[in-house]
Amino acid sequence: MAQQTPLYEQHTLCGARMVDFHGWMMPLHYGSQIDEHHAVRTDAGMFDVSHMTIVDLRGSRTREFLRYLLANDVAKLTKSGKALYSGMLNASGGVIDDLIVYYFTEDFFRLVVNSATREKDLSWITQHAEPFGIEITVRDDLSMIAVQGPNAQAKAATLFNDAQRQAVEGMKPFFGVQAGDLFIATTGYTGEAGYEIALPNEKAADFWRALVEAGVKPCGLGARDTLRLEAGMNLYSQEMDETISPLAANMGWTIAWEPADRDFIGREALEAQREHGTEKLVGLVMTEKGVLRNELPVRFTDVQGNQHEGIITSGTFSPTLGYSIALARVPEGIGETAIVQIRNREMPVKVTKPVFVRNGKAVA
């Protein structure tokens, strides 16, 4: 039986089409995925992300533990509330999960991990935390709502009290603050400004209804996927998994190679991969009629005349741009164009950086 978030009833009241998403009943859309997508790009939309797992870590050696557990380096986190995006890797350099870590105090950090990877993440974290004496608390008492779009922060702020408004005033991206019973973070998965707000389960439904009344449009998983793909943001199990290096998933920037003496899980394997080279993640744009879909082959000939083949990891029609876009994992040596096989047709595509839209504007 699939689990329900505390907002399940609100979704049905809003007319959602519900689907099973990794064991959770979640809204796919509320009538029009396209309208929901455009609401986030032009105004404000919101997503129930209560299926995500919030994990609090406490103990005097928490920073030391996270410097070992994660490929990015929490030594960078010196200001309370600052957040960091990182891969959590296995010994062979594959990605167990991608996550966000928040620093509050020297003995208190918070992780937000994916729902699909919840059980293996918790098992891995618990196993490696034991020698460090870390106290692990899974915050199943909290729901989370992501409010995203150019007007999202202003509309969400109409629900805040004076102290909460003051707490978030001037807050830069990738920060979080506990303000009353709300944990408000300037993070998201859409390429737009906004907040991800964690709050007690029993208060979630009222908060959701108040956001609807403030003019924030409920949005489902369909729009969440097209928005994150336009923004060039990875989806676990598509762009990366335990067999794929972060170097092949456009996550090289999340690996803190320095200081060279920091030992983190997967480091040795990553250094070998860096030396020998890996595949890479690129963007694809197709302005011809048709849609680039997951798992379609991507073919190109390198400058030496050798033929290569890669694969589309995520593809869709972009509502913002009006044509098809994709992320693809391909061998090194790809040029500015490639061919994608769609049924029995060879379609030309332009190769770009793996990001297409930022703050509502095309970058590809």
UniProtKB/Swiss-Prot annotation:
<dbReference type="GO" id="GO:0004047">
    <property type="term" value="F:aminomethyltransferase activity"/>
</dbReference>
<dbReference type="InterPro" id="IPR022903">
    <property type="entry name" value="GCS_T_bac"/>
</dbReference>
<keyword id="KW-0032">Aminotransferase</keyword>
<keyword id="KW-0808">Transferase</keyword>
<dbReference type="InterPro" id="IPR027266">
    <property type="entry name" value="TrmE/GcvT_dom1"/>
</dbReference>
<dbReference type="GO" id="GO:0005829">
    <property type="term" value="C:cytosol"/>
</dbReference>
<dbReference type="InterPro" id="IPR013977">
    <property type="entry name" value="GCST_C"/>
</dbReference>
<dbReference type="Pfam" id="PF01571">
    <property type="entry name" value="GCV_T"/>
</dbReference>
<comment type="subunit">
    <text>The glycine cleavage system is composed of four proteins: P, T, L and H.</text>
</comment>
<dbReference type="GO" id="GO:0019464">
    <property type="term" value="P:glycine decarboxylation via glycine cleavage system"/>
</dbReference>
<protein>
    <recommendedName>
        <fullName>Aminomethyltransferase</fullName>
        <ecNumber>2.1.2.10</ecNumber>
    </recommendedName>
</protein>
<dbReference type="InterPro" id="IPR029043">
    <property type="entry name" value="GcvT/YgfZ_C"/>
</dbReference>
<dbReference type="InterPro" id="IPR028896">
    <property type="entry name" value="GcvT/YgfZ/DmdA"/>
</dbReference>
<comment type="similarity">
    <text>Belongs to the GcvT family.</text>
</comment>
<dbReference type="InterPro" id="IPR006222">
    <property type="entry name" value="GCV_T_N"/>
</dbReference>
<dbReference type="Pfam" id="PF08669">
    <property type="entry name" value="GCV_T_C"/>
</dbReference>
<dbReference type="GO" id="GO:0005960">
    <property type="term" value="C:glycine cleavage complex"/>
</dbReference>
<dbReference type="InterPro" id="IPR006223">
    <property type="entry name" value="GCS_T"/>
</dbReference>
<comment type="function">
    <text>The glycine cleavage system catalyzes the degradation of glycine.</text>
</comment>
<dbReference type="GO" id="GO:0008483">
    <property type="term" value="F:transaminase activity"/>
</dbReference>
